[in-house]
């Protein structure tokens, strides 16, 4: 019983440590969501949570919204076959 509990705890920890991160992307244009206030940013946090769920976090990194704590299948920038108007 203790072994099963330890295995379950380890699997939960691995899922937390290896959570996906990436730039928030507009699926129609392929462009990143831009931001100008670097670091903690209410806009990025709100947009990341809206697109990826309440567990997601977000902040402004290199003038783009960077989302954290995403599920593994989350779609992030860059998108295949989407060039963001050549940018």
Swiss-Prot record:
GO terms for molecular function: sodium channel inhibitor activity; toxin activity. This is Beta-toxin Cn4. Disulfide bonds join 31-84, 35-60, 44-65, 48-67. The lineage of its organism: Eukaryota, Metazoa, Ecdysozoa, Arthropoda, Chelicerata. It is found in: Secreted. Beta toxins bind voltage-independently at site-4 of sodium channels (Nav) and shift the voltage of activation toward more negative potentials thereby affecting sodium channel activation and promoting spontaneous and repetitive firing. This toxin affects the activation mechanism of sodium channels of squid axon. It also competes with Cn2 in rat brain synaptosomes. Is lethal to mice. Keywords: Amidation, Disulfide bond, Ion channel impairing toxin, Neurotoxin, Secreted, Signal, Toxin, Voltage-gated sodium channel impairing toxin. One of its GO terms (biological process) is defense response. The keyword Iron does not apply. GO terms for cellular component: extracellular region. SMART domains: Knot1 (SM00505). The modification Asparagine amide is found at residue 85. CDD domains: neurotoxins_LC_scorpion (cd23106).
